[in-house]
């Protein structure tokens, strides 16, 4: 789904639209979606929520991870460089739901910045992969027992700070 490019209208601008239209087809089990992080951001949605929604419906066929600074044009920035917490949430929801265990793969839909020298023209891919791997390690270390305790005690500020400390290497 892509909400506003190349024009400002789209029949299936979000994962929800894709799934609704696919349900009306003669063979909905053959239809799924490709979630791109930046496209969800362009639609004003949280990419991790879109991923989780599609996975819960059994309809996430692939993901294209990247990043975006606001609702401008599709920037295809390196994954995690603008919205690190959002990037972490995307990696975490993919891991929690076993994405990749059945042959699915993660794509990196990123592009080099306009004035990048030829010899540096692949750094955006390297940076995206390094950030993904680092966030995967953080997701592996996530303390679900602490999360349960915080939710039980309604200590959402404590949980929020735990996640931030985890991302900053303080937890």
Please provide the spans of the model-predicted regions:
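Eukaryote-skewed repeat-based solenoidal scaffolds used as protein-protein interaction platforms
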Residues: 2-9
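Histidine-acidic metal/acid-base catalytic patches
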Residues: 10-171
């Amino acid at each position: 789904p892509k909400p506003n490019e190349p024009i400002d209208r789209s029949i299936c601008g979000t994962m929800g639209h894709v799934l609704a239209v696919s349900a009306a087809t003669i063979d909905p089990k053959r239809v799924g979606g490709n979630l791109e992080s930046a496209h969800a951001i362009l639609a004003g949605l949280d990419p991790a929520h879109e991923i989780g929604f599609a996975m819960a419906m059994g309809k996430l066929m692939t993901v294209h991870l990247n990043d975006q600074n606001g609702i401008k044009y599709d920037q295809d920035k390196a994954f995690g460089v603008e919205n690190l917490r959002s990037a972490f949430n995307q990696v975490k929801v993919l891991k929690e739901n076993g994405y990749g265990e059945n042959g699915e793969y993660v794509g990196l839909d990123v592009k080099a910045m306009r004035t990048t020298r030829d010899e540096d023209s692949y750094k955006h891919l390297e940076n995206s992969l390094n950030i993904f791997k680092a966030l995967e390690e953080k997701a592996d270390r996530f303390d679900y027992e602490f999360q349960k305790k915080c939710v039980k005690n309604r200590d959402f500020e404590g949980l929020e700070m735990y996640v931030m400390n985890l991302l900053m290497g303080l937890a």
